């Protein structure tokens, strides 16, 4: 299956929490091993574990993570807030490849998640078309990029 088809699942997962994650973005993530989804998750609401954490924790055989690909709709965070950085968990679990729907323009992230992953040897790929992922979080992006509500 292509990265584009797999990334569509991220959008589906993220939409499960529509209207409940503010001020955080909607994010879906899952993990593929040998072409099969072995774990998935989404960010349920602010202050709770992020999608990447939910996906990683849902994997029944964690030893498979070291030969798996993580797909996520948004660049993994790289800062400490109410939860620790997802990029740190990804490298701690030795996930070798991450495919991202779109980058996160939040000043706390904005390339830092990708930078952390790459500096730890993780192969990072982006969706060929980030538009559906940006549209998913247009309210979040408007607030972060223009410092105003989405109208």
Q: What is each model feature region?
A:
Residues 1-20, 62, 81-151:
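Zinc-dependent deaminase
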Residues 3, 43-59:
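Acidic helix/loop or adjacent segment enriched in Glu/Asp that either coordinates divalent metal
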Residues 24-27, 68:
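Acidic, glycine-enriched active-site microenvironments
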Residues 27-35:
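Short beta-strand scaffold segments in enzyme catalytic cores
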Residues 42, 49-50, 70-91:
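Local cysteine-cluster metal-coordination motifs and their immediate loop/turn environment
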Residues 60-67:
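Phosphate-handling active-site elements
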